[in-house]
């Protein structure tokens, strides 16, 4: 299983194809997660596995975001790196809605309004998450929700 390391602009930086352990869990109705366990090496890998960088798996439809990097040292087994995180949709947890917001209209329009005002094109440019888009659903059940 090959992983591509992506920077915050989703530009590929490197391929990660050797590791001691990889757990990659896709979930249907919850955030997926991953954990990589690898010995520390001198090929610059550590500098590319930064918090808020992304990992793309050739065997998955989900992109994961790196949330934690830990280095552990052991006299017997040497230095090891543990990288973990969750699937990209977990980014929505990082945003709050400022003030009270009253929504009217369809469910889909409400979701679009909240995403636009807090992630896609907020008034405070520091709150914007690049490359985040809203794609309206054509599913008749979603469109019919009020």
Report each predicted region and the residues it spans.
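Charged- and aromatic-enriched interaction segments used to assemble
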Residues: 80, 86-146
């Amino acid at each position: 299983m090959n992983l591509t390391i992506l920077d915050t602009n989703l530009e590929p930086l490197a391929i990660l194809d050797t590791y001691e352990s990889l757990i990659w869990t896709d979930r249907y109705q919850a955030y997926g997660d991953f954990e990589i366990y690898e010995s520390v090496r001198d090929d610059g890998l550590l500098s590319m596995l930064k918090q808020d960088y992304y990992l793309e798996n050739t065997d998955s439809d989900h992109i994961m975001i790196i949330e934690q990097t830990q280095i552990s040292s052991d006299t017997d087994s040497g230095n090891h790196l543990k990288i973990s995180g969750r699937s990209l949709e977990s980014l929505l947890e990082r945003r709050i809605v400022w003030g009270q917001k009253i929504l009217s209209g369809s469910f889909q329009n409400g979701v679009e309004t909240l995403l636009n005002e807090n992630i896609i094109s907020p008034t405070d440019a520091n709150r914007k998450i690049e490359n985040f888009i809203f794609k309206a659903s054509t599913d008749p059940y979603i469109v019919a929700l009020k």
